[in-house]
Design a protein with these regions (language model features):
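Extended, highly charged segments
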Residues: 1-235
Length: 235
């Protein structure tokens, strides 16, 4: 109790220095309590407020993560073309508690849909995930370390993988892959979208995170028009 020696008992307030403003500040006291008891009262109040702040901070982070997750699912819905695509999205919504389960619990829908597959002007194969499950499959099971990974910067969107097969990508292929990443993202309606790209070996899965969520650090980016200029490879 730094200022306890200045109190004689029965005071209703005390004046001390605010070290942040260098101005005196008056602190209300309970005249029925001793200086030590008043100090303990404020200390307990501080601890309670600190716990509340920490709980609210954690809740804010959790809510932000859920919003990001739902926005990524919303983007996948915009992409979905077939019933099997919708079934995979429904499975994700159920698995993460956004919709209630019906029927036997624990039964998962087998992932049967395939990613979009394009061929670049220079002959490189480009794959685009249709939903978060596919994004995980593409990035962490299908792609090899030196393949190139593209994603719209800071917004929900598909993982785009360019298979290198030991070759250097042409500028044209970078541009075409960037356009696909822009088109299959929340930024589809914009004139331009900033796209991050990096070799797949530098993309890491976050332990315990929802499917499709990754961490990476790159200084490589390009600005692309959200459009499809390539023909899809079917089959």
């Amino acid at each position: 109790n730094t200022y306890g020696y200045e109190l004689t008992g029965g005071e209703k307030e005390m004046t001390c220095m605010n070290y942040y403003t260098n101005e005196p500040i008056k602190i209300p006291l309970d005249s029925q309590l001793t200086s030590r008891e008043n100090a303990q009262k404020y200390f307990d109040k501080y601890n309670k407020l600190k716990r509340t702040f920490e709980a609210l901070t954690a809740l804010t982070v959790e809510t932000k993560e859920e919003i990001d997750h739902l926005e990524s699912i919303s983007t996948a819905l915009d992409i979905a073309l077939k019933e099997e695509d919708l079934m995979e999205i429904k499975q994700e919504l159920t698995e993460y508690g956004f919709i209630k389960k019906h029927g036997p619990s624990g039964k998962k829908v087998k992932i049967t849909s395939r990613p979009f597959h394009y061929l670049s002007s220079d002959g490189f194969h480009i794959y685009v995930g249709k939903n978060n499950y596919q994004n995980d499959e593409l990035t962490f099971k299908f792609a090899t370390g030196n393949d190139w990974w593209f994603h719209a910067k800071g917004i929900p969107g598909s993982h785009v993988i360019v298979k290198c097969e030991g070759k250097d990508l042409s500028d044209k292929t970078f541009e075409e892959a960037g356009s696909l990443a822009a088109y299959y993202s929340k930024g589809r309606g914009n004139e331009k979208v900033e796209i991050d790209y990096i070799q797949k070996k530098n993309v890491k899965k976050v332990t315990g995170a929802a499917p499709g969520f990754v961490i990476y650090h790159t200084n490589f980016s390009l600005v692309a028009e959200p459009r499809i200029t390539l023909t899809e490879v079917l089959g």
